[in-house]
Swiss-Prot record:
<dbReference type="Pfam" id="PF00579">
    <property type="entry name" value="tRNA-synt_1b"/>
</dbReference>
<feature type="short sequence motif" description="'HIGH' region">
    <location>
        <begin position="12"/>
        <end position="20"/>
    </location>
</feature>
<keyword id="KW-0436">Ligase</keyword>
<dbReference type="GO" id="GO:0005524">
    <property type="term" value="F:ATP binding"/>
</dbReference>
<feature type="binding site">
    <location>
        <position position="196"/>
    </location>
    <ligand>
        <name>ATP</name>
    </ligand>
</feature>
<feature type="binding site">
    <location>
        <begin position="157"/>
        <end position="159"/>
    </location>
    <ligand>
        <name>ATP</name>
    </ligand>
</feature>
<keyword id="KW-0547">Nucleotide-binding</keyword>
<keyword id="KW-0030">Aminoacyl-tRNA synthetase</keyword>
<keyword id="KW-0963">Cytoplasm</keyword>
<feature type="short sequence motif" description="'KMSKS' region">
    <location>
        <begin position="203"/>
        <end position="207"/>
    </location>
</feature>
<dbReference type="GO" id="GO:0004830">
    <property type="term" value="F:tryptophan-tRNA ligase activity"/>
</dbReference>
<dbReference type="InterPro" id="IPR014729">
    <property type="entry name" value="Rossmann-like_a/b/a_fold"/>
</dbReference>
<comment type="similarity">
    <text>Belongs to the class-I aminoacyl-tRNA synthetase family.</text>
</comment>
<keyword id="KW-0648">Protein biosynthesis</keyword>
<dbReference type="InterPro" id="IPR002305">
    <property type="entry name" value="aa-tRNA-synth_Ic"/>
</dbReference>
<dbReference type="GO" id="GO:0005829">
    <property type="term" value="C:cytosol"/>
</dbReference>
<dbReference type="InterPro" id="IPR002306">
    <property type="entry name" value="Trp-tRNA-ligase"/>
</dbReference>
Amino acid sequence: MSKKRVLTGVTTTGIPHLGNYVGAIRPAVRAAQNLDTESFLFLADYHGIIKCHEPEMIHQSTQAVAATWLACGLDPERTTFYRQSDTPEVMELNWILTCITAKGLMNRAHAYKAAVQANAENGQEDPDFGVEMGLFSYPILMTADILMFNANEVPVGRDQIQHVEMARDIAGRFNHRFRELFTLPEVKIDENVELLVGLDGRKMSKSYGNTIPLWENDKKTQKSVNKIITNMKEPGEPKQPDESPLFEIYKAFSTPSETVEFTKMLADGLAWGEAKKLLAAKINAELAEPRERYNELTADPSQIEEILQAGAAKARKEARELLDKVRDAVGIRPLK
């Protein structure tokens, strides 16, 4: 029985925070340990430059994201871990797929439609004002990322479902027009994946400014946790889990029995200040070893580069084999 292929891409436009760890990194690392799964994880730096035009940010984020995944337990021996820009076969496939993709399909992409709508609301006569081709056609690049390794499943958030559906559409069009070479990928949505709340109770997000950094030291983590909003109840007054986002964050770092005990402590009047100390201790305990590893990797980025180059060599070997078949299918062949 062949293994199921799962492919995940991570953009390189920021430094991962605690919400990324709980919602994406931790579950993905655990899933990659499944013996029935063949995992591919890539740093989507070409996707990153679609919106981010700051070279140093792209460069620094690539290092930080790679170090984060490795520090959090990603095993490059079990997962093909590579940088998108190190696999030129993906970009060649991107062009071939661009040549068979209907413009109307791209017109329906959510990101493009949102840009057009924003222009209309702002009174712009040109609906495409400010729209660059990277934004317009990036679903095709995402399709190339997926099809290059014939992934069976692509874990995505609900806002990304459309892109996997587009990948299926484009793969089907190629298979029908030329040759059956591509697997039709399936969306994978894990309903049990936690969406961590931030300091203010909304989803933890850089755009909200409510994040808890992942790689700060113990004291700074405590300072961040101290900013979690709470009500004015005094020590000794009973408190309910839904009265502060603190409880949901605590739950993400605790066993079910520990969560039950914490609920009881709140009901018995645990002071918010003490509750925050308990939470910070939980976070710091789980991240102690990953933080040490992260600091080692970022102090010597050549370690990261070596791992990425090894992953790229592995990825390219496989990509080349499929791309040769694709080129042959569309008529790009040696002259004999």
